[in-house]
């Protein structure tokens, strides 16, 4: 079993059950769940929840709440209703982390204090359900487009169940210096998502968005293997003890058999675990020496 790393259902094609089966067969013990996989289940949300629980995979997190912060009036009220519905699904899945991405809406304010106020409100909505909110800065976000800015508003919001969601794609796309990781509180990093990309640079927001949604690759498969390994090592030295999830949107992978894609993820997890972090991987029970 590969501990500490998981896959995201958005990476794979097919039914929810087949995705969960492929992830489990590849040796992972956790899964990042996409709301579309849950609400799109032919048997409805209840059967989707049952499938996740039957898989034995621990939910890493539930995604994704978009464009929540910085709105006003009827737009804000609408987003609060959406957030409540997503939090209820998150709780039904026994998932402890909801991922929220920074707003790209031109209707959203750029006032950081108002953004922090809205994020605090979101966190308070999650408290009765025992859910943490991981706030991630999209590299094409209108105001928050680097993890340093996301961390700033998380600190301003000052809610114990509101923390940072860190995505390596956005770090590399925005070219945020990795030294900034040292300013973070490891206990307030609620989720780390890892992926690589084939381009050295994505200078425009449009390029970042297109690449992020269609052509990410697994860690070690792209041109950022060295800085990605550096990022993981910096987080480890910082004291981060949470989960790593492979968030890999890739149109090509959607056309490949599930086991083949899951095996690519497995290779990445082993590379990070053994060659980067130098951890030993426990043998399956049947192969452990007895006596």
Pin down the residues of each PLM region.
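N-terminal pre-domain/capping segments
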Residues: 1-96, 127, 163, 194, ...
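Acidic-and-aromatic substrate-binding clefts and catalytic sites of carbohydrate-active enzymes
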Residues: 9-16, 33-47, 67-77, 104-113, ...
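Short acidic/histidine-rich active-site segments
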Residues: 243-248
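Active-site acidic/histidine proton-transfer and metal-coordination neighborhood
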Residues: 17, 69, 73-164, 173, ...
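A structural motif
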Residues: 28, 95, 189, 240-241
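Non-catalytic positions within long, well-ordered alpha-helices that form the structural scaffold/packing
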Residues: 24, 91, 185, 236-237
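Acidic/histidine-rich catalytic cores of soluble enzymes
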Residues: 30-31, 62, 121-225, 276-279
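A short, acidic, amphipathic alpha-helical segment used as a generic capping/interface helix at domain edges
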Residues: 223-238
């Amino acid at each position: 079993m590969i501990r500490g790393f998981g896959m995201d259902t958005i990476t794979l094609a097919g039914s929810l059950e087949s995705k969960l089966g492929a992830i489990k067969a590849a040796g992972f013990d956790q899964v990042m769940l996409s709301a579309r996989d849950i609400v799109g289940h032919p048997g409805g949300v209840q059967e989707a929840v049952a499938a996740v629980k039957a898989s034995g995979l621990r939910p890493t997190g539930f995604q994704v709440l978009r464009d929540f912060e910085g709105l006003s009036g009827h737009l804000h009220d609408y987003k609060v209703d959406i957030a409540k519905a997503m939090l209820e699904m998150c709780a039904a899945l026994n998932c402890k982390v909801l991922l929220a991405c920074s707003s790209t809406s031109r209707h959203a304010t750029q006032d950081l204090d108002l953004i922090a106020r809205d994020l605090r409100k979101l966190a308070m909505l999650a408290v009765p359900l025992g859910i943490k909110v991981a706030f991630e800065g999209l590299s094409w976000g209108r105001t928050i487009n680097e993890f340093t800015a996301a961390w700033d508003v998380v600190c301003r919001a000052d809610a114990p169940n509101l923390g940072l969601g860190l995505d390596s794609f956005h770090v590399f796309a925005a070219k945020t210096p990795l030294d900034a990781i040292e300013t973070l509180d490891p206990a307030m990093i609620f989720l780390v998502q890892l992926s690589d990309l084939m381009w050295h640079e994505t200078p425009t927001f449009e390029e970042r968005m297109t690449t992020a949604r269609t052509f990410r690759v697994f860690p070690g498969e792209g041109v950022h293997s060295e800085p990605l390994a550096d990022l993981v090592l910096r987080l480890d030295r910082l004291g981060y003890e949470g989960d790593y999830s492979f968030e890999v949107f890739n149109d090509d992978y959607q056309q490949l058999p599930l086991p083949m894609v899951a095996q690519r993820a497995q290779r990445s997890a082993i590379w990070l675990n053994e060659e980067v972090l130098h951890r030993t991987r426990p043998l399956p029970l049947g192969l452990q020496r007895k006596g």
